[in-house]
């Protein structure tokens, strides 16, 4: 594979994470406007976004096998057609059924693209470089989280229709589509297999279970927190939509900076120990945010939370890939799927909590989930295999 083609595939991976990040993160910003558009309470409206998360989950789960049947290039080109149809449906459709269908399609496209992006990084890069590349790729999720809430706030403040926010997100897929046209993709399945090398199956071990639970709790906690921050800030502290949007943007800006910093720092530390410390710090920072009565402190606490939690998810995935001597794409995909289940459950879990106890109750629940991540990381220390495989500094 030549360097220019590798660079194009790497940028496809970057954009794939940005696309998923944008779709998932702007939900909290546009939810109120969409609820008003369909004359529904916000807590009821949040349930329809489960279609987006379900689409992401189903496509990531199925694509572990579909990638070996349908060429990656064809999947991405077909995804572009689906993306155009879904955004057109959001703009032209007036029913809740059409909205839910379009959200599901956007989820499917996003999940397929992100699973391909993750595969490309794990396929093209190995060892220490894989971990840092995955972390940098994941930073584009955060970058989208920094940019698109600002874009959404600008559009909504000017009374521009909420569906234009999704049209702006669609521009990311235009970039993916153009790069795809000029790229050569690795071949999977029997055509790409080396017939001369037997496949050796390794047992995953109980450490993978702890990592999977941690991944699920982390994503559910993170999204359950960040999706309800705008609602919490406006209702509890009387902020306007721009101020609430800035809080979300502050979180993802700090998160992105943290990813860049930790991509250099992590190689000097044992991954299990550092992720345990980061989970403890993140739990503490979220507790400070949830418990403070001073609106001026919210920005400081949410930036601290973003920074210390930035490396947790990617480190969990990297630790998962190091639980076997030879990295297993299916193992990585399994942990990624568990994280995506957390995404899908976001509004299923937090919707009823908000309906009964308000946004503050959802944030407190998210804090409890972060505590569960810390416990899982602590337990992992007793069973992890990454040290015995000589992967301590990866």
UniProtKB/Swiss-Prot annotation:
GO terms for molecular function: transmembrane transporter activity. The keyword Transmembrane helix applies. It is found in: Cell inner membrane. Pfam families: MFS_1. It is a multi-pass membrane protein. The keyword Kinase does not apply. The chain crosses the membrane at residues 11-31, 51-71, 76-96, 101-121, 134-154, 162-182, 206-226, 251-271, 274-294, 302-322, 334-354, 363-383. SUPFAM superfamilies: MFS general substrate transporter (SSF103473). InterPro entries: MFS (IPR011701), MFS_dom (IPR020846), MFS_trans_sf (IPR036259), MFS_TsgA (IPR023528), MFS_TsgA-like (IPR050375). Belongs to the major facilitator superfamily. TsgA family. This is Protein TsgA homolog. The gene is tsgA.
